[in-house]
Each structure stands twice: as C-alpha cells, then as structure tokens.
Amino acid sequence: MGEQKQTFIEHLTELRKRLIISFLAVGVGFAGSYVVSKQIFNFLAIPLQKALPPDSTMIFTSLPEAFFTYLKVSLLAGIFVASPMVLYQVWLFVAPALYSHEKRYVVPFVIISSLLFLAGGAFGYFVVFPYGFKFFMSFATDYIQPAPKLKEYLSFCSMLLITFGLVFELPVFVLFLTKLGVVDAKMLSKNRRYVILIIFLGAAVLTPPDVVTQVMMAIPLMALYEVSIVLAKLVGKKKARAQDSR
C-alpha cells in the first residue's frame, strides 16, 4: 500500500510539474502576443474591412472593451504559440504509460492533427470569411449601416476558426472511431449521400446564395470525408490481417 501511495504521489508531482511548465509557456506566449495584439487583431479584421462599405470602421461601446479585446487576442495567440510546448508536456506525462508500439503513433498523430487544425482555420479565414462577410453586408441599406463591435467580432471569428479547425479533424476522428470498432468503411460509404446532403446544406447556410461559392466550400469537406473512408478501409484491412495471422 505504501509503495502504491508513493507512486500515486509521484504521479501527482509529475502532473503538477507539467501543468506549471504549460502555464508558464502560455504566460510567455501571452506576454509576447500582447506586444503585437493590435497587429494580430488587425490581421483578423482584414476580411471584414474589405467587406465593409467605404469609410466604415469598427467600434467599441464601453470604455474597457478595446483593452479587454486585446487581452483576449493575446490569450488566444499565447495559447496557440505555446501549444507545441503544452503538447510536449502532455507527451512527457503520458509516455511512461504507453507501450513502445503505441508511442510510434503519438508524434504523427500530433503533427497531422495540428496541420489539419491549421488548415481548417486557414480555410475559414481565407475562403469562408471573405464571402461570408460580403453576404452579411448585403443586408445593409441606406438606412441600415453596419457598425461591428470589437468584442463581438473577435468572439465570432474565434468561434468560426475553432469550428473549422475541428471540422478538418474529421479524418483523425474517424480513424480513432474505426480503431475502436464504432464505425467502418462500409458504414461510411453507405451513408455518403446523407453526409453530402448535410455538407451542401451547411455550405448553403454559411455562404452567399450562389452555386459557385457553395461548391467551393463543400468540396474540401467532401474530400475530407472521402479521405476518412480511405483511412477506415486501411484500418479495416490491417485488423483483418491481424486476425488471420492469429
């Protein structure tokens, strides 16, 4: 019992160490990002600025709103900058509990997941934002003019960028479910038509009402789903070979 208790205490000590290092990394990233927080926000605002009518500007309606907006920008950027160090600390904590064959998958998993998340965010920023903002601006009239607030715009952008980043994680998510036996390639292929319908409905809601834009948004999502099916097939074949060899 004493040895088990000591082992448990060692785990808590190790967890505390990794958390402290992770928080310090985020703190350093936050401090560095705050220096250029205005530039970061200006970069996020470029798609909206291009969609706004001439001479239009963003506003803040409470005295501390701009200050807290820049703090939030700094925190989000700090977490992003510190994410490699945070993931490394997670790896150092869980690695001793993994088998050698499991450790081989960790680095590729982290790299691929990170790249897919960045690709999703970039897709949202460079593709969806410009067309989406133009669509929203189309509702303006001579009597109704846009006056977007800093705080609301940052929240809106953050939500969409994170959403698109998570959507682009679809192949990794499906691969994980396939390994657990929850889904397989046959099931994914069988439901392809329903997934395509959902994708186009989502594209129709998020983009202006023209076919070209909707297709431009739907194609990457359809491609990700097809990649997921291919990965599920590969996992299924590997499982079948492993069972045959027993």
Model-derived features: positions:
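Membrane topogenic/interface segments and analogous intrinsically disordered interaction regions
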Residues: 1-246
